[in-house]
Amino acid sequence: MLYLAKMRNAEGEFTENEQKIATFLLAHVGELKTVSSRNMAKQLEISQSSIVKFAQKLGANGFTELRMALIEEHSVSREKKRDKAVHLHSSITSEDSLEMMARKLNREKIVALEETYNLMDYERLEQVINLISKAPLIQITGVGGSALVGRDLSFKLMKIGFRVACEVDTHVQATIAQALRQGDVQIAISYSGSKKEIVLCAEAARKQGATVIAITSLADSPLRRLADYTLDTVSGETEWRSSSMSTRTAQNSVTDLLFVGMVQLNDVESLRMIERSSELITLLDRS
Protein backbone atom coordinates (compact mmCIF):
# COMPACT_ATOMS: atom_id res chain seq x y z
CA MET A 1 0.00 0.00 0.00
CA LEU A 2 1.73 3.20 -1.17
CA TYR A 3 0.34 5.73 1.31
CA LEU A 4 2.69 8.53 0.23
CA ALA A 5 1.48 8.25 -3.38
CA LYS A 6 -2.12 8.11 -2.21
CA MET A 7 -1.77 11.33 -0.23
CA ARG A 8 0.04 13.16 -3.04
CA ASN A 9 -2.39 12.12 -5.77
CA ALA A 10 -5.71 12.34 -3.90
CA GLU A 11 -5.45 15.71 -2.16
CA GLY A 12 -8.60 16.97 -3.87
CA GLU A 13 -10.65 14.28 -2.12
CA PHE A 14 -9.74 15.40 1.41
CA THR A 15 -11.80 17.49 3.81
CA GLU A 16 -10.17 20.53 5.43
CA ASN A 17 -9.01 18.54 8.46
CA GLU A 18 -7.88 15.60 6.32
CA GLN A 19 -5.86 18.00 4.17
CA LYS A 20 -4.18 19.36 7.31
CA ILE A 21 -3.21 15.82 8.30
CA ALA A 22 -1.95 14.90 4.82
CA THR A 23 0.10 18.10 4.54
CA PHE A 24 1.64 17.52 7.96
CA LEU A 25 2.52 13.88 7.26
CA LEU A 26 4.07 14.69 3.87
CA ALA A 27 6.08 17.57 5.35
CA HIS A 28 7.32 15.57 8.35
CA VAL A 29 7.57 12.06 6.92
CA GLY A 30 11.22 11.86 7.93
CA GLU A 31 10.40 12.64 11.57
CA LEU A 32 7.41 10.34 12.16
CA LYS A 33 9.28 8.03 14.55
CA THR A 34 8.80 10.66 17.26
CA VAL A 35 5.27 11.77 16.29
CA SER A 36 2.21 10.60 18.25
CA SER A 37 -1.42 11.10 17.26
CA ARG A 38 -1.95 13.04 20.50
CA ASN A 39 0.81 15.57 19.81
CA MET A 40 -0.18 15.80 16.17
CA ALA A 41 -3.83 16.48 17.05
CA LYS A 42 -2.76 19.20 19.49
CA GLN A 43 -0.47 20.85 16.94
CA LEU A 44 -3.09 20.78 14.17
CA GLU A 45 -5.93 21.72 16.56
CA ILE A 46 -8.04 18.73 15.57
CA SER A 47 -9.29 15.63 17.40
CA GLN A 48 -7.32 12.38 17.64
CA SER A 49 -10.33 10.56 16.19
CA SER A 50 -9.96 12.66 13.01
CA ILE A 51 -6.44 11.31 12.59
CA VAL A 52 -7.59 7.71 13.12
CA LYS A 53 -10.41 8.15 10.59
CA PHE A 54 -7.96 9.64 8.09
CA ALA A 55 -5.68 6.61 8.46
CA GLN A 56 -8.65 4.29 7.92
CA LYS A 57 -9.73 6.27 4.86
CA LEU A 58 -6.33 5.54 3.33
CA GLY A 59 -6.74 1.83 4.08
CA ALA A 60 -4.82 1.45 7.36
CA ASN A 61 -6.32 0.02 10.54
CA GLY A 62 -5.25 3.05 12.55
CA PHE A 63 -2.68 5.82 12.90
CA THR A 64 0.04 3.53 14.28
CA GLU A 65 -0.15 1.27 11.23
CA LEU A 66 -0.17 4.29 8.89
CA ARG A 67 2.79 5.90 10.70
CA MET A 68 4.90 2.72 10.54
CA ALA A 69 4.05 2.22 6.85
CA LEU A 70 5.02 5.82 6.04
CA ILE A 71 8.33 5.42 7.88
CA GLU A 72 9.05 2.27 5.85
CA GLU A 73 8.06 3.91 2.55
CA HIS A 74 10.25 6.93 3.30
CA SER A 75 13.19 4.67 4.10
CA VAL A 76 12.78 2.68 0.88
CA SER A 77 12.40 5.91 -1.12
CA ARG A 78 15.64 7.32 0.32
CA GLU A 79 17.50 4.11 -0.55
CA LYS A 80 16.23 4.25 -4.13
CA LYS A 81 17.32 7.88 -4.43
CA ARG A 82 20.79 7.00 -3.17
CA ASP A 83 20.98 4.13 -5.68
CA LYS A 84 20.26 6.39 -8.64
CA ALA A 85 21.92 9.59 -7.38
CA VAL A 86 25.19 8.83 -9.24
CA HIS A 87 23.61 8.96 -12.67
CA LEU A 88 20.07 10.38 -12.32
CA HIS A 89 18.49 13.69 -11.33
CA SER A 90 14.89 14.64 -10.64
CA SER A 91 14.09 16.13 -14.06
CA ILE A 92 15.33 16.41 -17.63
CA THR A 93 17.22 19.60 -18.48
CA SER A 94 18.48 21.14 -21.70
CA GLU A 95 22.03 20.21 -20.65
CA ASP A 96 21.37 16.46 -20.43
CA SER A 97 23.00 14.07 -22.88
CA LEU A 98 20.81 11.63 -24.81
CA GLU A 99 22.04 8.83 -22.58
CA MET A 100 21.10 10.79 -19.45
CA MET A 101 17.65 11.56 -20.85
CA ALA A 102 17.17 7.89 -21.70
CA ARG A 103 18.02 6.88 -18.14
CA LYS A 104 15.68 9.47 -16.64
CA LEU A 105 12.80 8.56 -18.93
CA ASN A 106 13.32 4.88 -18.21
CA ARG A 107 13.24 5.51 -14.46
CA GLU A 108 10.15 7.72 -14.74
CA LYS A 109 8.28 5.04 -16.66
CA ILE A 110 9.33 2.30 -14.23
CA VAL A 111 8.06 4.34 -11.27
CA ALA A 112 4.73 4.99 -13.05
CA LEU A 113 4.33 1.26 -13.72
CA GLU A 114 5.29 0.19 -10.21
CA GLU A 115 3.01 2.66 -8.45
CA THR A 116 0.07 1.97 -10.78
CA TYR A 117 0.33 -1.80 -10.29
CA ASN A 118 0.90 -1.49 -6.53
CA LEU A 119 -2.21 0.67 -6.10
CA MET A 120 -4.39 -1.44 -8.40
CA ASP A 121 -7.58 -2.87 -6.86
CA TYR A 122 -7.40 -6.31 -8.48
CA GLU A 123 -10.85 -7.42 -7.28
CA ARG A 124 -12.34 -4.37 -8.97
CA LEU A 125 -10.25 -5.06 -12.08
CA GLU A 126 -11.69 -8.58 -12.26
CA GLN A 127 -15.23 -7.18 -11.96
CA VAL A 128 -14.52 -4.72 -14.77
CA ILE A 129 -13.12 -7.45 -17.04
CA ASN A 130 -16.24 -9.56 -16.49
CA LEU A 131 -18.49 -6.58 -17.25
CA ILE A 132 -16.66 -5.71 -20.46
CA SER A 133 -16.68 -9.33 -21.62
CA LYS A 134 -20.50 -9.36 -21.53
CA ALA A 135 -21.06 -5.95 -23.14
CA PRO A 136 -22.85 -5.92 -26.52
CA LEU A 137 -20.95 -2.73 -27.38
CA ILE A 138 -17.85 -1.12 -25.88
CA GLN A 139 -17.22 2.58 -26.41
CA ILE A 140 -13.78 4.02 -25.63
CA THR A 141 -13.37 7.79 -25.18
CA GLY A 142 -10.27 9.94 -24.76
CA VAL A 143 -8.64 13.19 -25.89
CA GLY A 144 -5.04 13.75 -27.00
CA GLY A 145 -2.60 11.17 -25.64
CA SER A 146 -5.43 9.35 -23.88
CA ALA A 147 -7.14 8.92 -27.25
CA LEU A 148 -4.04 7.11 -28.53
CA VAL A 149 -4.19 4.76 -25.55
CA GLY A 150 -7.87 4.14 -26.25
CA ARG A 151 -7.20 3.48 -29.93
CA ASP A 152 -4.60 0.86 -29.04
CA LEU A 153 -7.04 -0.88 -26.67
CA SER A 154 -9.81 -0.81 -29.28
CA PHE A 155 -7.63 -2.57 -31.88
CA LYS A 156 -6.72 -5.27 -29.37
CA LEU A 157 -10.31 -5.88 -28.28
CA MET A 158 -11.57 -6.00 -31.87
CA LYS A 159 -8.86 -8.53 -32.64
CA ILE A 160 -10.46 -10.96 -30.16
CA GLY A 161 -13.99 -10.43 -31.39
CA PHE A 162 -15.49 -7.55 -29.41
CA ARG A 163 -17.60 -4.78 -30.93
CA VAL A 164 -15.80 -1.54 -30.14
CA ALA A 165 -16.56 2.07 -31.02
CA CYS A 166 -13.50 4.31 -30.66
CA GLU A 167 -13.47 7.60 -32.53
CA VAL A 168 -10.95 10.42 -32.14
CA ASP A 169 -13.46 13.13 -33.08
CA THR A 170 -15.11 14.23 -29.82
CA HIS A 171 -18.36 15.13 -31.61
CA VAL A 172 -18.61 11.55 -32.83
CA GLN A 173 -17.73 10.29 -29.34
CA ALA A 174 -20.69 12.24 -27.94
CA THR A 175 -22.99 10.94 -30.67
CA ILE A 176 -22.04 7.34 -29.89
CA ALA A 177 -22.40 7.91 -26.12
CA GLN A 178 -25.99 9.13 -26.40
CA ALA A 179 -26.89 6.00 -28.41
CA LEU A 180 -25.52 3.48 -25.89
CA ARG A 181 -27.92 1.11 -24.15
CA GLN A 182 -28.18 -0.75 -20.89
CA GLY A 183 -25.53 -3.47 -20.85
CA ASP A 184 -23.13 -1.46 -23.02
CA VAL A 185 -19.87 -0.23 -21.49
CA GLN A 186 -18.04 3.07 -21.92
CA ILE A 187 -14.32 3.12 -21.05
CA ALA A 188 -13.38 6.77 -20.43
CA ILE A 189 -9.63 7.49 -20.37
CA SER A 190 -8.53 10.79 -18.83
CA TYR A 191 -5.71 11.28 -16.33
CA SER A 192 -7.10 14.60 -15.07
CA GLY A 193 -10.69 13.36 -15.16
CA SER A 194 -11.81 16.90 -15.95
CA LYS A 195 -11.80 17.11 -19.77
CA LYS A 196 -15.25 18.47 -20.57
CA GLU A 197 -15.61 16.33 -23.70
CA ILE A 198 -14.99 13.12 -21.76
CA VAL A 199 -17.20 14.16 -18.84
CA LEU A 200 -20.03 15.04 -21.25
CA CYS A 201 -19.76 11.63 -22.92
CA ALA A 202 -19.76 9.89 -19.53
CA GLU A 203 -22.88 11.79 -18.49
CA ALA A 204 -24.62 10.80 -21.73
CA ALA A 205 -23.64 7.15 -21.29
CA ARG A 206 -24.91 7.05 -17.70
CA LYS A 207 -28.17 8.64 -18.80
CA GLN A 208 -28.65 5.82 -21.32
CA GLY A 209 -28.05 3.15 -18.67
CA ALA A 210 -24.58 2.13 -19.85
CA THR A 211 -21.79 1.31 -17.38
CA VAL A 212 -18.98 3.88 -17.22
CA ILE A 213 -15.46 2.68 -16.42
CA ALA A 214 -12.90 5.45 -15.87
CA ILE A 215 -9.16 5.01 -16.26
CA THR A 216 -8.00 8.07 -14.35
CA SER A 217 -5.78 9.42 -11.57
CA LEU A 218 -6.50 9.15 -7.85
CA ALA A 219 -7.48 12.82 -7.63
CA ASP A 220 -11.10 13.74 -7.13
CA SER A 221 -12.62 14.78 -10.48
CA PRO A 222 -15.96 15.03 -12.31
CA LEU A 223 -15.19 11.83 -14.23
CA ARG A 224 -14.24 9.92 -11.09
CA ARG A 225 -17.52 10.92 -9.44
CA LEU A 226 -19.54 9.93 -12.51
CA ALA A 227 -17.93 6.53 -13.09
CA ASP A 228 -19.42 3.25 -11.93
CA TYR A 229 -15.91 1.81 -11.68
CA THR A 230 -12.48 3.44 -11.62
CA LEU A 231 -9.10 1.94 -12.52
CA ASP A 232 -6.42 4.15 -10.99
CA THR A 233 -3.23 5.34 -12.67
CA VAL A 234 -0.28 7.04 -10.96
CA SER A 235 2.17 9.25 -12.82
CA GLY A 236 4.82 11.68 -11.61
CA GLU A 237 5.63 13.80 -14.65
CA THR A 238 8.95 15.63 -14.98
CA GLU A 239 9.18 19.35 -15.69
CA TRP A 240 9.36 18.59 -19.41
CA ARG A 241 5.96 16.93 -19.81
CA SER A 242 6.70 15.69 -23.33
CA SER A 243 3.36 14.25 -24.45
CA SER A 244 2.75 13.12 -20.84
CA MET A 245 4.92 10.08 -21.41
CA SER A 246 4.73 8.52 -17.97
CA THR A 247 0.98 9.15 -17.89
CA ARG A 248 0.55 7.20 -21.12
CA THR A 249 2.82 4.47 -19.75
CA ALA A 250 0.57 4.13 -16.69
CA GLN A 251 -2.59 4.18 -18.83
CA ASN A 252 -1.19 1.59 -21.24
CA SER A 253 -0.30 -0.68 -18.34
CA VAL A 254 -3.95 -0.66 -17.25
CA THR A 255 -5.37 -1.20 -20.75
CA ASP A 256 -2.89 -4.01 -21.39
CA LEU A 257 -4.01 -5.65 -18.14
CA LEU A 258 -7.62 -5.36 -19.30
CA PHE A 259 -6.79 -6.94 -22.65
CA VAL A 260 -4.81 -9.85 -21.21
CA GLY A 261 -7.59 -10.44 -18.70
CA MET A 262 -10.12 -10.56 -21.54
CA VAL A 263 -7.97 -13.05 -23.45
CA GLN A 264 -7.69 -15.21 -20.35
CA LEU A 265 -11.48 -15.46 -20.00
CA ASN A 266 -11.72 -17.28 -23.32
CA ASP A 267 -8.13 -18.14 -24.12
CA VAL A 268 -8.60 -20.80 -26.81
CA GLU A 269 -11.01 -18.77 -28.94
CA SER A 270 -9.14 -15.50 -28.34
CA LEU A 271 -5.79 -16.96 -29.37
CA ARG A 272 -7.41 -18.52 -32.43
CA MET A 273 -8.76 -15.12 -33.52
CA ILE A 274 -5.41 -13.42 -32.87
CA GLU A 275 -3.69 -16.03 -35.03
CA ARG A 276 -6.28 -15.68 -37.78
CA SER A 277 -5.85 -11.90 -37.73
CA SER A 278 -2.07 -12.30 -38.05
CA GLU A 279 -2.51 -14.66 -41.00
CA LEU A 280 -4.75 -12.16 -42.81
CA ILE A 281 -2.25 -9.34 -42.24
CA THR A 282 0.52 -11.57 -43.61
CA LEU A 283 -1.54 -12.10 -46.77
CA LEU A 284 -1.98 -8.33 -47.12
CA ASP A 285 1.77 -7.81 -46.80
CA ARG A 286 2.39 -10.29 -49.62
CA SER A 287 0.04 -8.59 -52.06
Swiss-Prot record:
Entry annotated with the keyword rRNA-binding: no
One MF term in the entry's GO annotations: DNA-binding transcription factor activity
One GO term (biological process): N-acetylmuramic acid catabolic process
Domain of life: Bacteria
UniProt xrefs under Gene3D superfamilies: Glucose-6-phosphate isomerase like protein, domain 1 (3.40.50.10490), Winged helix-like DNA-binding domain superfamily/Winged helix DNA-binding domain (1.10.10.10)
Domain SIS: 128-268
Entry keywords, A to Z: Carbohydrate metabolism, DNA-binding, Repressor, Transcription, Transcription regulation
Pathway: Amino-sugar metabolism; N-acetylmuramate degradation [regulation]
The keyword Transcription regulation is assigned to this record: yes
DNA-binding region of this protein: 37-56
UniProt cross-references to Pfam families, sorted A to Z: HTH_6, SIS
Domain HTH rpiR-type: 1-77
Primary role: Represses the expression of the murPQ operon involved in the uptake and degradation of N-acetylmuramic acid (MurNAc). Binds to two adjacent inverted repeats within the operator region. MurNAc 6-phosphate, the substrate of MurQ, is the specific inducer that weakens binding of MurR to the operator.
Alphabetized PANTHER family for the sequence: GLUCOKINASE, HTH-TYPE TRANSCRIPTIONAL REGULATOR MURR
Subunit structure: Homotetramer.
Xref: HAMAP family: HTH_type_MurR
Name of the molecule in the record: HTH-type transcriptional regulator MurR
Organism expressing this protein natively: Salmonella arizonae (strain ATCC BAA-731 / CDC346-86 / RSK2980)
Record lineage: Bacteria, Pseudomonadati, Pseudomonadota, Gammaproteobacteria, Enterobacterales
